[in-house]
Amino acid sequence: MQANIKWLDDPEIFRVNQLPAHSDHPFFKNYREWQNNHSSFKQSLNGMWQFKFSKDPQSRPVDFYKKDFNTSSFTTIPVPSEIELNNFAQNQYINTLYPWEGKIFRRPAYALNKSDAEEGSFSEGKDNTVGSYIKHFDLNPELRDHDIHIVFEGAERAMYVWLNGHFIGYAEDSFTPSEFDLTKYIKEKDNILAVEVFKHSTASWLEDQDMFRFSGLFRSVELLAFPETHLVDLDLKPTVCDNYQDGIFNAELKFTGSLNGHVHLSVEDVNGSAILEQDVPLDSEVEFTSSTLENIHLWDNHHPYLYQLLIEVHDENGHLVELIPYQFGFRRIEINQDKVILLNGKCLIINGVNRHEWNAKTGRSITLNDMEKDIDTFKENNINAVRTCHYPNQIPWYYLCDQNGIYMMAENNLESHGTWQKMGQVEPSDNVPGSVPEWREAVIDRARNNYETFKNHTSILFWSLGNESYAGSNIVAMNEFYKEHDSSRLVHYEGVVHRPELKDQISDIESHMYLPPKEVAEYLRNNPQKPFMECEYMHDMGNSDGGMGSYIKLIDEYPQYVGGFIWDFIDQALLVYDPISKQNVLRYGGDFDDRHSDYEFSGDGLMFADRTPKPAMQEVRYYYGLHK
């Protein structure tokens, strides 16, 4: 198969040779590797890569992936990082519009005219910058003689991959891992990995989030080797019984490779005492189910109790070939007959924030240290919940939320604001995904990626279908996907407020943005059909968050009011050296000669971009502290 640049124009082509999404479980060779948190099955490709920036597809080095290509005109770029923050391209912050508005006329394929494929819209677009990446590497000795995959944790926005001159695959969906099989073409030494990243494709219509519009390999890249038998997917289903004291543990495991041997599974409490042990023969699919486990510890914000799961994979001689550790908790979320959301039988209260991934120096390419600082800030200010606005976050964030009892709304990578809201008005004539058949599989794929990757994380209480994408049959299909695959969580989507006739088919929650407290109370007084949530409220721009108490009072008055997520946690601003003041200063949208721009609207966080709290954080600490 050969790569085809026309895939950029086709909403029905969003993955080519990309492996199916699966659980994010770690795996190790033995217990020593686990204890040292180092897997010999992994090889990082982070670091300096050769790089060529092109202003449009026509000027890109088309044959750069070939082994004999002359790369003397290439420079270097660190991976992970944003292309724009390495001074190759223009920084631009936009809220609702698309980056090309006012410059190039585009409409989503098949949206206005069912026969209009919009051919050449992106493959010939003069505004579509391209990053051509090359990485030379040798395979670590520990990875040799194994099947080898490559995982790109995040690439904005469309990516083609070659290895040693051979086309490997194509991927979109910028914020979930893209995994490819390299086994057929990889060598022990002198490998040449080539990656071509386009800033725009049909995926751009689905990724119109309120943020700086970056591109490139902005998350880690790594190689994975697999032992002779490998756990490819883990699906945990810990269930809390009706008495909220006992539980049942179920796990479904899928294996690849040799199936001669056995699997040993154990579950330990925090003291290291086993509460469950089972041993079964290997098979392509294995299921473990416990009898009733009495007096289990429940997981919540106050007591984020996690059990330790250990899965040992043994070959036919009894030798350990793979160890899979995973922590999970028992918790139960449900809506009772009074339309009250209960967690472990008690009324759930969300003291939440919307959180973009952000670092003032590196943009959305953040570190574990950034995440840990944010968790500390949550705890200091009585924040107990987070919405991953408006895309899946880096995998370590989900583990941190599990460990620290942070309730999570796990949102899909979907926002198409600019296709239906124009000049502040609702005008959905060219909305996607809407009910356009050609866009359905792309958004179902995003839902599947989000679900399969993060399905085992106890902290996730809500799946969110996306943000500000209007509503239609494709959003209904996403809702149905989650309902079919996961009965242990609730589904959220705010955009259905614009299509009230679909409310019975979309979202378990009546979700709004910035609805005044009086109107919230009016809904709750009039026989509410669903519990109520503000998925965005208390817009934190400037000297803000006054009147927060009016919302918090609703928690005491109406048990159907679950609370909400403040918009938002941290400013999107960049630390830049100012030659006049000779100081590093924070610059916002519009400060980079970016036009069009939504200017300082990028600065509506409870913290400045350098993670210094704003005065409004005091208000949050006080009011969220009233219902810890």
From Swiss-Prot:
PROSITE patterns: GLYCOSYL_HYDROL_F2_1, GLYCOSYL_HYDROL_F2_2. It catalyses: Hydrolysis of terminal non-reducing beta-D-galactose residues in beta-D-galactosides. The keyword Nucleotide-binding does not apply. SUPFAM superfamilies: (Trans)glycosidases (SSF51445), beta-Galactosidase/glucuronidase domain (SSF49303), Galactose-binding domain-like (SSF49785). It comes from the Bacteria. Its EC number is 3.2.1.23. GO terms for biological process: lactose catabolic process. One of its GO terms (cellular component) is beta-galactosidase complex. The keyword Transcription regulation does not apply. Keywords: Glycosidase, Hydrolase. One of its GO terms (molecular function) is beta-galactosidase activity. The active site is at E468, E536. Component of a beta-galactosidase. PANTHER family: BETA-GALACTOSIDASE. Belongs to the glycosyl hydrolase 2 family. Heterodimer of a large (LacL) and a small subunit (LacM). This is Beta-galactosidase large subunit. It comes from Lactobacillus acidophilus (strain ATCC 700396 / NCK56 / N2 / NCFM). The gene is lacL.
